[in-house]
A protein has these predicted regions:
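An N-terminal assembly and electron-transfer interface module characteristic of large anaerobic redox
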Residues: 1-184
């Protein structure tokens, strides 16, 4: 990282290292968020391309990602997700993506930060019945999933709260980015 013209930050945990290099070595950084909304992924790639002075041709990848979502929706039209924060991404952004794709998200397990409020605002408008739970809350030890309506979970923590539902842990070391995150 210390010999680069700029650093590319793909995970928020790397931001502090990039800021340190910027402050100590005057190496700028660009942060790209892990997103699951295909329109936002496309916008982010376009903005990144402008910074680099290139054009990305991502239509094929976007179409594939949107086809993957459509196929899953066709196969599981009743999918109702609990999304946790112990996964590769922001649970609020992923929940917003799932709702925009036409799925239900009755529950989100996550820690609210200033970065999440843009998603929370949209979620409250599109899915006011979605509940947000904090993993830090001691009473979560007594959480009862019986009446949640959840039939699928994403994130290790969501799987913990719903042990009888299918779970995608989604927190491996190899973390898909961009459209690959949608298709996998």
């Amino acid at each position: 990282m210390s010999e680069a013209n700029f650093n590319l930050v793909l995970h928020p945990e790397a931001r502090f290292a990039a800021e340190d290099f910027h402050n100590r070595l005057q190496i700028p950084f660009i942060e790209l968020r892990r997103l699951y909304q295909t329109d936002k992924i496309a916008s982010q790639y376009q903005a990144f391309g402008k910074v680099l002075g290139v054009t990305f041709s991502d239509e094929v990848y976007r179409e594939k990602a949107e086809e993957t979502v459509a196929k899953f929706k066709e196969k599981r039209p009743d999918a109702s997700f609990a999304i946790g924060e112990c996964m590769n991404g922001d649970p609020f952004e992923m929940a917003l993506a799932m709702i925009k794709y036409g799925f239900k998200v009755p529950e989100i397990y996550g820690t609210l930060t200033a970065e999440n409020f843009i998603y929370l605002n949209q979620l409250s408008q599109l899915s006011p019945e979605t509940k947000v739970f904090s993993n830090m809350e001691p009473t979560m030890l007594y959480y009862d999933p019986e009446k949640s309506g959840v039939n699928m979970t994403i994130g290790k923590d969501a799987g913990y709260y719903h042990p009888d539902q299918p779970n995608v842990i989604w927190n491996q070391d190899r973390q898909p980015y961009g459209y690959a995150g949608v298709t996998r």
